[in-house]
């Protein structure tokens, strides 16, 4: 904990701009109850009753009202931060909020009151055991949620669903570690603690439960991050038309002139609550046009960063030599969907089929559709969800971040290595115990029982000021 973590802090807790209500929040840190009572007198002209809403004037230094609104006092530890907290809820104009904020700073100068840093209120909630780290991150995820599914999943994380699963896993690992340690510490007793307690069965249960939690976390990470989908192919195969069809709006210019799209056009759409970041790119071809060359170079950059590439072809001509040359340059680790567009000109029905061959593209899928008429668009959306690994109706999903997935995969690897050492050889048992300890350490890092100050700084710096 840093020395500044106990400073009294203040910030505007509502979004910038104009609104019906604006909130100024004060958390008093080491200044405590005496400062809370003194500030309520100075700011509101009255002692506030704990956990009661009082309609009061917000006073300037001369005792004149700056605004009128609701004032609340939450004594420690029953507050968001676990400290004594004052909230002033007035009108949401930027000028009046700044005046109230400055008045708070002036009135609290004697107590060392300062402006809060981004995420500092939630950081204090974490440090004071009001939230664990996964719940604290869920606060930011709930604020930033771009879909209903993401918001509901963030709410489940904030409610502690993710944390409860992690704590249950940690408890199981600790219980198994105790058996291993007992066997190592009391060899003279000749008691097979591991065999008596079915240690291998417990380890299998941990592995099964860990795989389940990791699966849910992957779903949650997909809700949070979405999928980057790049439309690639030769000019004039209908990439812009497909973007418009997927988005349900005219976002890109569509003309019969090859090379119309010179730079990327991006749009985020929702499919079953999953954000799909669709990127239309410049057509891939040999050209002497310098501007078009720049656009083509950017296209390949987008392809390198993509989660999925939609390789568009003209359904009338199919996969030609130039298309094969383009496909050969696609990164091996990026899933590709071959999209044969313009089926309205061939009268072929919309369809989806697996056409993969070879090790690199064994799961290659081919979708036939008409972006112009909308035929087959739902088939393509379904294929994108399949590639993403989304399981429809995943009601228990909680929002997760990349660091959570990394920690869960690392824990899974340590538990797998522990299973390799699950015999009665003393040296193997030492390794068994160490792998379990490392797995526990990874799981604890998710909820913050084991976290570096650097990690905490990065997480909370991404919050808004008033949180």
From Swiss-Prot:
GO terms for biological process: tRNA methylation; tRNA wobble uridine modification. Residues 226-389 form the TrmE-type G domain. Pfam families: MMR_HSR1, MnmE_helical, TrmE_N. Its cofactor is K(+). It is found in: Cytoplasm. GO terms for cellular component: cytosol. K(+) binds at residues 236, 255, 257, 260. One of its GO terms (molecular function) is GTP binding. Binds 1 potassium ion per subunit. It is an enzyme of class 3 (hydrolase). Homodimer. Heterotetramer of two MnmE and two MnmG subunits. Belongs to the TRAFAC class TrmE-Era-EngA-EngB-Septin-like GTPase superfamily. TrmE GTPase family. Exhibits a very high intrinsic GTPase hydrolysis rate. Involved in the addition of a carboxymethylaminomethyl (cmnm) group at the wobble position (U34) of certain tRNAs, forming tRNA-cmnm(5)s(2)U34. This is tRNA modification GTPase MnmE. It comes from Burkholderia thailandensis (strain ATCC 700388 / DSM 13276 / CCUG 48851 / CIP 106301 / E264). The lineage of its organism: Bacteria, Pseudomonadati, Pseudomonadota, Betaproteobacteria, Burkholderiales. The gene is mnmE.
């Amino acid at each position: 904990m840093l020395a500044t973590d106990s400073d009294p802090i203040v910030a505007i807790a509502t979004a910038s701009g104009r609104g019906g209500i604006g909130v100024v929040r004060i958390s008093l840190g080491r200044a405590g109850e005496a400062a809370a009572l003194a500030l309520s007198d100075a700011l509101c002209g009255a002692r506030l009753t704990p956990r009661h809403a009082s309609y009061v004037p917000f006073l300037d230094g001369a005792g004149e009202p700056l605004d009128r609104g609701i004032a609340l006092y939450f004594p420690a530890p029953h507050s968001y931060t676990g400290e004594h907290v004052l909230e002033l809820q007035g009108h949401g104009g930027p000028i009046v909020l700044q005046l109230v904020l400055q008045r708070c700073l002036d009135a609290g100068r004697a107590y060392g009151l300062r402006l809060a840093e981004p995420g500092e209120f939630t950081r204090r909630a974490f440090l004071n055991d009001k939230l664990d780290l996964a719940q604290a991150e869920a606060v930011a995820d709930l604020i930033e949620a771009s879909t209903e599914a993401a918001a509901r999943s963030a709410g489940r994380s904030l409610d502690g669903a993710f944390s409860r699963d992690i704590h249950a896993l940690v408890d199981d690992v600790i219980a198994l570690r105790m058996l291993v340690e007992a066997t190592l510490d009391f060899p003279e007793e000749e008691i097979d603690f591991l065999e008596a307690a079915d240690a291998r069965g417990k380890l299998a249960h941990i592995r099964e439960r860990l795989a389940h939690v990791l699966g849910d976390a992957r779903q949650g990470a997909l809700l949070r991050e979405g999928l980057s989908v790049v439309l690639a192919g030769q000019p004039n195969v209908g990439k812009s038309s497909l973007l418009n069809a997927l988005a349900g709006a005219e976002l890109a210019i569509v003309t019969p002139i090859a090379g119309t799209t010179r730079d990327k056009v991006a749009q985020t759409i929702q499919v079953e609550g999953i954000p799909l970041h669709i990127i239309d790119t410049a057509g891939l071809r040999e050209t002497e046009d310098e501007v078009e060359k720049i656009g083509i170079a950017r296209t390949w950059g987008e392809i390198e960063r993509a989660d999925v590439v939609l390789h568009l072809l003209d359904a009338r001509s199919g996969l030609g030599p130039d298309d094969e040359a383009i496909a050969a340059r696609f990164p091996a680790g990026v899933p590709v969907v071959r999209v044969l567009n313009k089926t309205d000109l061939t009268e072929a029905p919309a369809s989806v089929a697996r056409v993969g061959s070879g090790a690199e593209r064994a799961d290659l899928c081919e979708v036939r559709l008409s972006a112009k008429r909308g035929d087959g668009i739902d088939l393509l959306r379904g294929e994108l969800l399949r590639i993403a690994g989304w399981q429809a109706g995943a009601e228990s999903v909680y929002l997760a971040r990349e660091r959570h997935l990394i920690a869960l995969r690392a824990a899974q690897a340590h538990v797998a290595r522990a299973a390799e050492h699950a015999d009665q050889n003393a040296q193997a048992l030492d390794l068994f115990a160490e792998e379990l300890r490392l797995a526990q350490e990874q799981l604890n890092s998710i909820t913050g029982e084991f976290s570096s100050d650097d990690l905490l700084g990065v997480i909370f710096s991404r919050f808004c000021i008033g949180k």
